[in-house]
């Protein structure tokens, strides 16, 4: 991974386009819209194990085929900010034993707005000595011009020197949106391609009538940008830090038609069908929503059979998938009632087999 095959990028993307086109062919999908990535420095987060060798230590990764570890001194797929931090950080950690003793992993989360969180993970409890040393480390990095947050983590322990989040700014069709991103919770890794996904989703849902339901909304990445196209938006998310970030993002972007509820897709299905009542829904009148459109961005496993049935009840379905094979499994059912109006390939993960796909489905007839 040290030297990227930048000159082969276009050919590698064309291969993905062929593969996804073939996968979607049985469902009569229209021609793919293809959204390319920058060829380097596109990844806004990275995680590395730390290997100790005598008094020395360094970042390592593991080869996916051979499982052999290899040393990483620079990482061209990661943002330039992460690369600069990797170079600056290790010499400073080496100055203080309490900071590198039993350190086994470092996670980096950066933003286009030049903020970064460094998370230091340890096989030991963290005490006041660690905290004092970490404060010194942060000051040293700030003196080098870094806008940095430091988080220490150990078993059942987390210490934030100031905060455990960064605020990213993403541009969508010329408008800037603020997104709070919390350390150790999911965020889209490729900021440039994320903006393109948001723009595509906004374009698909333009001129929509009624309301939008989103399952698993995370920090509100999609629902905040999509709210402009709907009367009201109802979004579900199960992870507490993501819900808190989403609530901040709603306020920061002055969105007044988006309601987030903390429940799983399965629980939401039960609530909609009146199978059971939830205290979390007190004060929210589900009957006041006329959701004609549903948005889903499921994990790699795709949607389970019950959720597919729920999704099928909606007139229009916007489906973003990080695994086209499980997308196609779901389309076996969805294509019985819906047709694909638009399809897209988003190259979130250049130089890998991974493909991010989007389909916009409309009910037949």
UniProtKB/Swiss-Prot annotation:
GO terms for cellular component: cytosol. Its EC number is 2.1.1.-, 2.1.1.35. It comes from the Bacteria. S-adenosyl-L-methionine binds at residues 188, 216, 221, 237, 297. InterPro entries: MeTrfase_TrmA_AS, MeTrfase_TrmA_CS, SAM-dependent_MTases_sf, TrmA_MeTrfase, U5_MeTrfase_fam. GO terms for biological process: tRNA methylation. Coiled coil: none annotated. It catalyses: uridine(54) in tRNA + S-adenosyl-L-methionine = 5-methyluridine(54) in tRNA + S-adenosyl-L-homocysteine + H(+); uridine(341) in tmRNA + S-adenosyl-L-methionine = 5-methyluridine(341) in tmRNA + S-adenosyl-L-homocysteine + H(+). CDD domains: AdoMet_MTases. Pfam families: tRNA_U5-meth_tr. Keywords: Methyltransferase, S-adenosyl-L-methionine, Transferase, tRNA processing. The keyword S-adenosyl-L-methionine applies. GO terms for molecular function: rRNA binding; tRNA (uracil(54)-C5)-methyltransferase activity, S-adenosyl methionine-dependent; tRNA binding. The active site is at residues 322, 356. It is an enzyme of class 2 (transferase). Dual-specificity methyltransferase that catalyzes the formation of 5-methyluridine at position 54 (m5U54) in all tRNAs, and that of position 341 (m5U341) in tmRNA (transfer-mRNA). NCBIfam families: trmA_only (TIGR02143). PANTHER family: TRNA/TMRNA (URACIL-C(5))-METHYLTRANSFERASE (PTHR47790), TRNA_TMRNA (URACIL-C(5))-METHYLTRANSFERASE (PTHR47790:SF2). This is tRNA/tmRNA (uracil-C(5))-methyltransferase.
């Amino acid at each position: 991974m040290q030297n990227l095959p930048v000159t082969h990028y276009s050919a590698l993307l064309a291969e993905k386009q062929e593969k996804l086109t073939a996968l979607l062919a049985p469902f009569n999908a229209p021609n793919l819209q293809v959204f390319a990535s920058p060829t380097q420095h596109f990844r806004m987060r990275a995680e590395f194990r730390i290997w100790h060798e005598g008094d020395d230590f360094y970042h390592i990764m593991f080869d996916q085929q051979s499982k052999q570890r290899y040393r990483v001194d620079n990482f061209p797929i990661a943002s330039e900010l992460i690369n600069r931090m990797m170079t600056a950080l290790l010499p400073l950690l080496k100055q203080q034993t309490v900071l590198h003793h039993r350190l086994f992993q470092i996670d980096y989360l950066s933003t286009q707005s030049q903020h970064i969180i460094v998370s230091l993970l340890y096989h030991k409890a963290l005490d006041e000595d660690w905290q004092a040393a970490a404060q010194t480390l942060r000051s040293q990095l700030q003196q080098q011009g870094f806008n940095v947050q430091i988080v220490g983590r150990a078993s059942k322990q987390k210490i934030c020197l100031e905060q455990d989040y960064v605020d990213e700014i993403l541009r969508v069709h010329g408008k800037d949106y603020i997104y709070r991103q919390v350390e150790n919770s999911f965020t889209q890794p490729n900021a440039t391609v994320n903006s393109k996904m948001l723009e595509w989703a906004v374009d698909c849902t333009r001129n929509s009538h009624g309301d939008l339901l989103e399952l698993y909304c995370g920090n509100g990445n999609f629902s905040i940008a999509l709210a402009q196209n709907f009367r009201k938006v109802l979004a579900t998310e199960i992870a507490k830090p993501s819900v808190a970030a989403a609530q901040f993002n709603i306020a920061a972007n002055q969105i007044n038609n988006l309601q987030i509820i903390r429940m799983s897709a399965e629980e939401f299905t039960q609530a909609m069908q009146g199978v059971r009542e939830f205290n979390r829904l007190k004060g929210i009148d589900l009957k006041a929503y006329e959701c004609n459109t549903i948005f889903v961005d499921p994990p790699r496993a795709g949607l389970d059979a019950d959720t597919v049935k729920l999704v099928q009840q909606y007139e229009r379905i916007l489906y973003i998938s990080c695994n086209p094979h499980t997308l196609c499994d779901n389309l076996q059912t969805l294509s019985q009632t819906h047709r694909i109006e638009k399809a897209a390939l988003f190259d979130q993960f250049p130089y890998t087999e991974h493909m991010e796909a989007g389909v916009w489905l409309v009910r037949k007839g």
